[in-house]
């Protein structure tokens, strides 16, 4: 049997017309533009840094302002006046044979000499910290360079600054992997993948250790003053150790720039301590809730310490981050939570027995 024909269907709207896609006009690049071409990354989510990250940048990065130049000029003029007055006093004491005043002038000269030596030493350390930023820019240029001859000397200088011996296995592997036909980009990339991770691993261990100690100390300490002093000491020590690992010796002025961030960390610990004490007394929570609050407070302080260590590691490191090898705060967070849980479980086990 044949199926009956379906009735006709009339549509009111017009038929859709195929729309041809519109393309932009062709653009031709010359040879120089083609070599420097880099694809743009669209909708790239920026890493969440927060206000603490901005404070770190402001603390670790050297600042120059008109007021600072005026203060430095005034100090230099005052120092010159002190030296001139000291010379005049010395001449008068010698002419009048005032030996007591002459001894005082000699003691003052020794003190001034020690002060000048300290200023020169601090300036040299500050200059070394600024040179590290220039070395990082140079490494970034070499990672995009197709020339030859500069990469090996640059990497050998970095290894010498970091105190890596020529017989180190990582450095020997790097020497065995490079040859004369490789350009600067390949040589520096090999150094970044073979030698630099040795120092990065040591810095990560220092960050983990300091963050864990800060977390556990705050989680078990009942005194806010002890927490604040402990965090200050641990953070300053962490910065010094990371800088030493990368071949940088921090001076007094460099520590002053970092002290603002340390104060932020201390303020966090002290404020959270006050909130915990007032909240617990007001709400009359049990011991378990008190331990949970202390653990959360300790983890927060430990994460701030880890964030400080990551930023110090980034600014003391001679090479830029490549291939997403930058340490993430989430890695330290998981480790800190695991350590706090383990510590609390060990503390509950004897009490239950």
From Swiss-Prot:
Gene that encodes it: ycjF
Main location: membrane
Membrane-protein topology: Multi-pass membrane protein
UniProt xrefs under NCBIfam families: hyp_HI0043
Organism domain of life: Bacteria
Biological source species: Shigella boydii serotype 4 (strain Sb227)
InterPro entries (alphabetical): DUF697, UPF0283
Subcellular location as annotated: Cell inner membrane
Listed transmembrane segments: 70-90, 100-120, 213-233
Family assignment from sequence similarity: Belongs to the UPF0283 family.
Sorted UniProt keywords: Cell inner membrane, Cell membrane, Membrane, Transmembrane, Transmembrane helix
A Pfam entry, by short name: DUF697
GO cellular component: plasma membrane
Name of the protein this chain belongs to: UPF0283 membrane protein YcjF
